[in-house]
Every structure is written in C-alpha cells, then in structure tokens.
Amino acid sequence: MQKRIIECVPNFSEGRNMETIKQITDVIDASKGVKLLDVDPGEATNRTVVTFVGEPEAVCDAAVKAIKRATELIDMRQHKGAHPRMGACDVCPLIPVSGITLEECAELARALAKRIAEETNVPTYCYEAAAFKPERRNLAVCRAGEYEALPEKMMDETRKPDFGARPYDEGVAKTGATAVGARDFLVAVNYNLNTTSTRRANAIAFDVREKGRPMREGNPIVGKIMKDENGNTIMKPGTLKACKAIGWFIEEYGIAQVSMNMTNLSITPLHVAFDEVCRAAEARGVRVTGAEIVGLVPKSCLVDAGRHFLRKQNRSTGLPERELVRIAIESMGLSNLKPFNPEEKVVEYILEAEEQKGVKKLVDMTCTGFAEETASESPAPGGGSISAYMGALAAALGTMVANLSSHKAGWDDRWEFFSDWADNGMAVMNELLYLVDEDTAAFNKIMDVFGMPKGTDEEKAARAEAMEAATLYATQVPLRTMKAAYRAFDVVRAMAEEGNPNSVSDAGVGALAARSAVMGACLNVKINAAGLKDRAVADALVKEAEEIQAAAQKAEAEILAVVESKI
C-alpha cells in the first residue's frame, strides 16, 4: 500500500546563530515519524530553510513543536536580514510527496494554521493552495509590508490573519506572523549538453520554458523587442507549462546546461520535460547527454519516467518498482556526471530507510531465511503471512506470463494488452507482499495487549477494549489477503486463455497458489473471528470469507480446465 507522505519546508528567521538553529531542528529530529532531510542556513538573509518529511499527522505535530520553539528563541524585534519576512517562522508550506493530493495537503495546511494560532499564539495566514481568498494565493500579498506592517494589518478587515487575529500586542511583536500553505513538489534538474555555449543553452531554455522569450521585430535574435500598449514586453511562450529555465556554463563539468525548475509535476512530468529538451536541443544541433537532479525527487517521478521509456520501446511496464527506477536513471543519464543513488535522492526511500532501522521485515528475507523463520518455535509468522505470500507468488506467476507474452515474437501488436495485465498483476503482488508483514504485525498487536495492566476495573475495561480492537484487526487483515489473492485469478485466467502457450502451466500453478492463499487466509479469518465478543461482526466477516472461498475454488477449477486443455 502506498503510504501518505508529505514534505514540510519551514523557513525560520535565524540564519546566523547556529545554536538557535540547532535547538529548533533538534525538536524536529526528536519527533516520532518524521525524517529531517536538510538544514540550509543563510547568513545574509538571516534565514534557515529546513526540510523534513513523514506521514501527515507526524509532520504537522513536528511543525507545531518547531514553530513553538522558534517563537521562544527568536525575537522579531531584533531581526534584520536581506530576505522578506514577517515572523519567527516566516513560511511553512506542506508539499504532497506520495499517496496524497495537493487538495488534501491544502486542507492539512489550513488545519495546521489553525493549530499554530491556537497552540503557539502566532497569527497565521493561509497562502497558495491553502488560501481562503484568491488574492492570498500569492505569498507576497500575505507578506505585504513584512513584519513592520503587522501593527496595521492585525485588525484590518481586508489584511488581518486568517487565524489568531487580535490587537497588536507584545506577543505578536516578538513572534510576528506565519504563512502556512500547500504547494506542489518542486524539482530542480539540469540537462547536460554536448556544448560549451551558454548562448546555445539559453536558446534551448527559452524554447521550452513556459515564459518563453521576448518577441522581436524583424531579426529574431537582435531585432527590437516588441511591447504592448501598456509598454510590457510581448512574450512568445515556450513549450513546457510550469517550467522555468535558463542556460549556463558549468566550469566544474566543462559543459553548458539547461537549468530547470519544475513547479508542477502533474502538469509537466520529468520525462516529458526531458524529451522536450532533447527535441529542442536537437533542433539546434545540440545533444542532451544526461541530466542532473539537484536535491530530492518523489518516487513517482522516476517510476513514471521508467514506464514512459518502456512504452516508447513497446515494452511491458509491469516490472518491479526498483527496476522502473533503474530504467529511468539509465534513460535520462542521471549518472552522467556523478553516480545517482536512489537511496539518497528519492524521498520515500530515505524515509523507508529511517523507519526500517532495526526492523526485520519478512519480505526482505531470503527464501531460506523466511522458511527457517516460519519453522522456528515463534508463533509468527504463521498461516496468515504464508497465505499472503502464496497469493503474492500467484500474482507474480501471472505477471511473469504477461511479460513473456508481451515480448513474444510475432505478438508485437498485442504488447500493450499484456503490459496492462502485467501492471495489474504487479499491483496485486505488491499489496500481498505488504500483507505478509501486516499479518504478523496484527498478531503482535494481540500479544501486546496481553502485556497491558489488569489490576483495576478501569485497567481491565481498557484491556478488554484493546483486545477486541486488536482481534478485529487480526481478522480483517486475512480477509484483505483473501480479497487480494482472489484478484490474482484475473491475471492468471487471462494468461491461461490468452498468454504464451509455452507458459500455460505457470498460469495453472498461479491458480493453485491463489486458491491456496484464499483458503489459508479464510482459516485465519475464522480462528480470529472466534475471539470476537461482537458476534454480529464476527458472523458477517466469516460469511464474507466463505463466499470468497467458494468463488476461489470455482475460479481455480475453471482455470485448470483451460490449462489442461492446452497441455
């Protein structure tokens, strides 16, 4: 399952006192469920940009704590710096990374702004996607007049904060105000060119960037720049929306680059920009030799690119995520100048590495290790995890047949049909792999309840309530396994009927594995449901499980009949 991950980039109005900065970032570093990625202080601006990621609730909690600490340490009455600012924490944008939309981030930002005002007494404005008023989408409108204008703005009906508005007082004088917003993930990428010409690089940049280039009279290079009736330069737009770009020469590398900031990946994905820069460069006799990603990228950015470059080859995209990332790296030459390590550049991988420190996941074991762990005297992993893994193998077999079929000689016109089925199978496989560990985690939740105190009536009641909740979850997880494993029949059936006949036996084994996964998980639903006090809920769960089991047995028989007819 895709986790909901957001990024938070608060800008604190202190860039010179490293001890103060550390005290603020220590609060974030100590917050559970978030990963501090970067701390970038600026002396001239007297401002520090901090970046951290995590699940939404954890990120918002850490943001409130960090802003509270900043208001204790920073006195805006003493602040001077080159950058516009209006508070100890000047801005605090939330950015969707995975499993969450910009609209959902905007709702989170509004709730965060309200919390900050209530819990830290700092007035807050909502900007960009979180803005309540259209004009406040522009941060400059919220920050107009900066800190010095707050005495006038605090009670002005048109300029007062969205939350925490009150007469200007000593508290506001010390903390200032904070703008909380939501925006898309920004990706900075430099395209490497086989030229040293900044002029050529700039020409390519102007061809593609949304702003484009000034229109000229006569000669397009040196002709007089055209103006409208108001005296504004008339621009010829470039080909890529939501992209800003310039050309420059990098002495360290000895080449020119097109340097691009991508402000909305949903409008212009990375692979679309890469292809367009290649096209524009070729039109000017220049080649793109690779690309350099500056900073971090969301995983989807590379996965989508990997799929794109496979589709251009008429190749199946139903491959493991890491392979899609590798294909993206190779296709765009991301290691052209220096090695591109996804573990250090992909936001989700960085967060996963942090979360998995000291955690032993079943799906990361070798086949032998998993079997030996199952055979040990520990009660977990048990039948639930094994059922989920059998289901994952069923989906994997169907996916394998789809991938083999998509590349079969003479079947070139059907590659997309099989690619779609491979994608379907990979999605089912990934969900079942998640459930391998989740089933064991659900069992461990029950074990944790046994450790709860039961000395008083209140403790006994809390323990009983926790046991019912844990038992319910331990019943719901294998039911999810049943549903996912049953979906594996779709790809297995399609491949038995339409796939490469040389692999029809593999589809048959997939059907056997899917049936076993469903039946095994059904046993786990029944044994766990027996422990539920709420018998109406228990009976409903068992009834649903038995219906899925009956359908699975029927599907297996039908698929095996097809397989036997082709062997």
Task: Set out the residue ranges of the language-model regions.
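A structural-propensity feature for long, helix-poor, extended segments
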Residues: 407-453, 548-558
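Polytopic transmembrane helical bundles with strong interfacial aromatic enrichment
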Residues: 357-366, 372, 480, 487, ...
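Conserved phosphate/anionic-ligand binding catalytic regions in large, soluble enzymes, centered on
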Residues: 8-10, 86-91, 264, 374-401, ...
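A structural signal for well-ordered alpha-helices, especially hydrophobic packing surfaces
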Residues: 401, 429-436, 443, 475-482, ...
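Long, contiguous binding/interaction regions
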Residues: 1-365, 369, 376, 454, ...
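Preference for long, well-ordered alpha-helical segments
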Residues: 112, 122-126, 135-139, 488-491, ...
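Amphipathic alpha-helical interface segments
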Residues: 185-187, 442-512, 516, 528
